[in-house]
Amino acid sequence: MIKLVYCLRKRNDIDTDSFYRYWLDEHGPLVKSVAEEIGASRYVQSHTKLPELNQLMIESRGLKAPYDGVTEVWWDTMTALERGMSSPSGVEAQRKLIEDEARFIDFSRSRVFMTEEHEIF
């Protein structure tokens, strides 16, 4: 299984509650509406919570501030990913997603990468 991991930071001009609300209530349904076009089989949003516990983990490890959340998108096969990223409808869906992401995500402080999952337990 192929997975995209997208570590998000909100734009500075958006408050935290508005960021989470938009991501969940506006962007989430948009992703669902184009899932077939991009060939995705699963989409999960993980919203950062428990600031006190996060701060303890950061301090104990000497890490930087946490991301505001993480998006994960799965494709069942490399073929599904390639088809979803190269078909005309997939390319248009990606354009829509990126355009919408610019409304609430600070691209310069966020990170995205592709992975192959290895389930341990």
Feature map (PLM): residue ranges:
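Macromolecular interaction modules
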Residues: 1-121
